[in-house]
Amino acid sequence: MTLNPTVLVINCGSSSIKFSVLTADNCEAVISGIADGIGTEKPFLRIDRVTQFQLAKWNYSDALAAIADELDKRGLSKSISLIGHRIAHGGEIFSESVLIDDRVVEEIKKVSPLAPLHNYANLHGVGAARQLFPGIKQVAVFDTGFHQTLKPEAYLYALPYRYFREQGVRRYGFHGTSYRYVVGEAASFLGFDGSDCGLIIAHLGNGASLCAVQDGKSVDTSMGMTPLEGLIMGTRSGDVDYGALAYLARQTGQSLEDLDHMVNKESGLLGISGLSADMRVLENAYHEGHEGARLAINTFVHRLARHIGGHASSLRRFDALIFTGGIGENSSLIRQLTLEHLAVFGIDIDHAKNKRLQHGTSQIITTARSRVTAAVIPTNEEKMIALDAIRLGYAQQGTVVLEAVI
């Protein structure tokens, strides 16, 4: 039996491996899952949110081997023709996706100190996949790549210049794969000329950021050298005065490592609310009058609206605001509160459309008289990674599959 070719997409995190298998002809999802708890005593593998297995071992190689075994049991292993890897940080070396070879692996290692928690995990996944699927072309897709079009005035920190020159300390930005996908979808859905429009895209999830896109290129973004900067997130503080951290260190005796853990794991929505990092939990509590939840959501929205206003100044023209990501796509409350903050831009929300949005669909949520269009457009990072794998992996062969997908 001849199997239709598929693309395996791998995203290795600090303690998990997310994976998807997509058809190579139209990038439809065939199967997806997650190996979680890597590095703990109780790792498990869940497939399609239903089937769950305990894993006997808990490193990346064994977890990926278990994933490969499950794919083989389902008759999918032999269909895999390409593999795409999400890589967190490409530094200044990688501005676009690349086919993986030994040289590329070494270059990724060079920039990995910029994102040690994620890049080394990504590299474990690359190494394991190259062993498990020898001979299959693999592609690295960088979360920072889309933002390599930022100008120096947008990416430099006002620190002594030598730290940028010698250590690479600058703003890089993240969620680039999501932004690339949404930019393409926005042009077709909204009927814009992608080479002549100004967008602000709000990728709102447990990690959250903004990107100002002018004529299809990133010109500003809220995350910085790490994903900590910018918006309030689930457990990350976002922007915080360094002086406040220095004060805490002096007053409490906490170390740099203690403070780093605090701003990344104990802050954000969780820190303010004292209840949860999950926006769904906070929204329920918000409507029930929970003081901490209301404060967390109002502070989240204020920070978001303030950053949107700032990002607008990086555009030549502000045509549309796009909400995406888990919160952006599913929270009518956050969209409503944010747009109400942005009335100064002439944004006029259509409350009925905002509340009636069907899950997984794109929708304009402003009225015809709104000076700036606001819309919800679902992201699909796995599809974007698969498309890059197809574009690069089949390029040398001139395969018709590429033409069918693109």
Swiss-Prot record:
Pfam families: Acetate_kinase (PF00871). Transmembrane segments: none annotated. GO terms for molecular function: acetate kinase activity; ATP binding; metal ion binding; propionate kinase activity. One of its GO terms (biological process) is L-threonine catabolic process to propionate. Its cofactor is Mg(2+). Pathway: Amino-acid degradation; L-threonine degradation via propanoate pathway; propanoate from L-threonine: step 4/4. The record marks H175, R236 as: Transition state stabilizer. Mg(2+) binds at N11. SUPFAM superfamilies: Actin-like ATPase domain. Homodimer. This is Propionate kinase. It comes from Yersinia enterocolitica serotype O:8 / biotype 1B (strain NCTC 13174 / 8081).
